[in-house]
Amino acid sequence: MAVPKKRTSKAKKNARKANWKNQAKTEAQRALSLAKSVLTRKSNGFIYNLTEASDTFSD
């Protein structure tokens, strides 16, 4: 017969939730930073075709 496990304490639940939220915050900051660097063309991780890119941004 299946027996329910012991309940997780509030402290453990809150610690896991805080860890999860902190990881999400870090990823959001990285994504925003990457987006800003791409928009200002200061990123080194991407190769731009400057002839096509200048046409799209000149509008």
UniProtKB/Swiss-Prot annotation:
**Where does the record say this protein resides?**
Plastid, Chloroplast
UniProt keyword terms in alphabetical order = Chloroplast, Plastid, Ribonucleoprotein, Ribosomal protein
Q: The organism sits in which domain of life?
A: Eukaryota
Q: Where is the composition biased (Basic residues)?
A: 1-19
Q: Would I find Ribosomal protein among this entry's keywords?
A: yes
One of the protein's GO biological processes: translation
What are the disulfide bonds? Answer: none
Q: Which organism is it from?
A: Pyropia yezoensis (Susabi-nori)
What Gene Ontology cellular component terms go with this record?
A: chloroplast; large ribosomal subunit
Q: Can you say what this protein is called?
A: Large ribosomal subunit protein bL32c
Which residue intervals make up region (Disordered)?
1-26
The gene for this chain is rpl32
Q: Which HAMAP family match?
A: Ribosomal_bL32
Q: Which GO terms describe its molecular function?
A: structural constituent of ribosome
PANTHER family, per the entry: 50S RIBOSOMAL PROTEIN L32, CHLOROPLASTIC (PTHR36083), LARGE RIBOSOMAL SUBUNIT PROTEIN BL32C (PTHR36083:SF1)
Spell out the family assignment given in the record's similarity comment. Belongs to the bacterial ribosomal protein bL32 family.
